[in-house]
Amino acid sequence: VVGLGCQRGCDVHTLLGLLDAALADGGIERQRITALASIDRKHAEPGLLALARLLELPLQCFSAAQLAGYEQRLSHKSAVAFAHTGCYGIAESAALALAEQLSQRPARLLITRKKTAQATFALACAD
């Protein structure tokens, strides 16, 4: 499961570039991705919606309160993200939350937070 955070107006090409670069660095094929996750305030973000359509994957969004339960498992805590969203790490916590929801098992981060100027990426899986 890929978790994504992004600035308002971040376009699909920026998100796809980050996703592909992070997956390539991790040696993971794009077709192994089963879903995308983010925070609920991004549920209508055009770039995220376009990415989900392009990849033909579901996009599941979680509230900051739901993501807060993953705070202790984050590789990086962003004060900037917290100030804007109430969540210290959208990409990692959303990836963990959805991986656990889909598998009904504990999840772990396969690829920790990767970022560009406009977006963050993380990959989680359940063993």
State where each predicted segment sits.
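Generic secondary-structure signature for well-ordered alpha-helical cores
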Residues: 20, 24, 28, 38-41, ...
